[in-house]
């Protein structure tokens, strides 16, 4: 990696009341494996934050779980509340409760993840301007792309939601110091036609941890395997595969 310049990766890969809190997908809940009893204290934990109109039960979260399970990595993947005024307190409390070693985000999740300071974070195609995007995309009912734990099938984008995103976005990048710059990585698809905040990331975090990969906005298995997982393993100090 050349410091001070983006890395281009080529290859084959193209606080809410308790009753109101969304379910959290904890992908560590599997039968214990033989010989693992003494590893409990060394388990690593990832908090995965999904994109807009998605859920914790999406392909990237599931793949992280499957690929890292053998390394005793827990993946906590919440269904983020659709309203930003509810989502941010919910996520701050979740971080306090779960104490993740690493936060990995996709799209809208990067907006929230940027503000969860003090923890190493990987922001993949972060959507830092949700208010503007939703304003131009139009308001109305949207269907969730993935299964939600509460059974919800759709939700409404309205002026209140957009205003809440706009207020939240005012807090972006505040107080970013050298320590925060060292903790945060930005991964950007070279062919992302939906969202591209490379310049914003570089302005506030520099280019040392800015990675440009051969891909689009939505992640696929090849990109997760070739780009995301190697970085996650490195940051968690796991054996390279």
Name these PLM-found stretches.
Residues 26-42:
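Short, Lys/Arg-enriched N-terminal segments with co-localized hydrophobic residues
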Residues 104-113:
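Gly/Ala-rich beta-loop-alpha elbow adjacent to hydrolase catalytic centers
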Residues 44-97, 216-217:
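Active-site catalytic motif of lipid deacylating hydrolases and related acyltransferases
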Residues 13-16, 27:
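Short hydrophobic targeting helices and cationic amphipathic motifs
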Residues 120-241:
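The alpha/beta-hydrolase serine catalytic core
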């Amino acid at each position: 990696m050349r410091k001070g310049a983006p890395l281009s990766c080529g290859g084959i890969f193209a606080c809410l009341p308790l009753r109101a809190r969304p379910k959290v997908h904890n992908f560590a809940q599997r039968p214990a494996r033989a010989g693992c009893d003494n590893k409990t204290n060394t388990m690593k934990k990832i908090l995965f934050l999904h994109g807009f109109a998605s859920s914790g039960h999406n392909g990237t979260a599931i793949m992280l779980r499957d690929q890292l399970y053998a390394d005793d990595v827990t993946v906590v993947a919440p269904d983020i509340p659709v309203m930003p005024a509810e989502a941010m307190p919910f996520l701050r409390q979740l971080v306090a409760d779960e104490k993740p070693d690493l936060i990995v985000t996709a799209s809208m999740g990067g907006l929230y993840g940027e503000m969860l300071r003090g923890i190493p974070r990987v922001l993949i195609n972060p959507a830092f301007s949700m208010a503007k995007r939703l304003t131009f995309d139009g308001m109305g009912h949207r269907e969730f792309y993935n299964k939600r734990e509460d059974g919800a099938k759709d939700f409404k984008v309205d002026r209140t939601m957009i205003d809440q995103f706009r207020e939240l976005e005012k807090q972006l990048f505040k107080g970013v110091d050298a320590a925060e710059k060292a903790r945060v990585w930005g991964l950007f698809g070279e062919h992302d036609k939906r969202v591209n905040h490379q310049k914003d990331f570089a302005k506030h975090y520099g280019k040392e941890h800015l990675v440009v990969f051969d891909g689009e906005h939505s992640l696929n298995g090849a990109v997760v395997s070739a780009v995301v997982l190697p970085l996650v393993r490195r940051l968690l100090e796991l054996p390279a595969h």
